[in-house]
Amino acid sequence: MENMKIQRAMRFYLLATKLKYKIRTGWDQNHWNISSERIESVAEHVYGTCILAIALSSEFDIDVDLNKVLKMLVIHEISEVLIGDITPFDNITPQEKEELEHQAIISIIGDLATKGELIALMLEFDEHQTKESIFAYHCDKLEADIQSKVYQDMGYHHSLDEQENNVVFKSSKVQRMLDEGAETAFDIWYEYDKGIYTGDEPFVKALRYIKDNNTKI
């Protein structure tokens, strides 16, 4: 019995931590083609979302169950171990992506004793209905926006006229932003995502701060 417990725990750990070696697709040569020799991994993104959740809940005294939020954030990307990091621009519908993610997460969780809790957290996160899931979702999106600005400030983003292979530019929404005067990669990230945070002041303020300030500290 004890051996089975250890086996289940180690299987989950060894599978889930493969995210350390999965690169965030949005930064690859088919998307923003970040010029840094080392590109952010999915695990680093997950870590960033957790730090962001701790920081914002602390400074703004946000009424959420932080432990629940952190579990959601840790769990929500582990499907990418099996299916990779699928972006909104990768020719797959949101419904298809969600189904693939759910199947992958269930497979990775396996027979952990907390299987039911973890699957429930995954579903709650995806529905974006509870205060914890909305907060976690906003942390997930904002962390990516911040990373885009970090790359911008470090000089790792290419100019907008060097994006001939970027699938993001096939989006009519992105083309409209270019027509309206977007000058940098982060301009597009900012305009694309800012509406997500409408009415959620800590996130509105955080995104604006990142936009207006250099992230090099």
Predicted regions and their residues:
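Alpha-helical, largely C-terminal catalytic domains
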Residues: 1-217
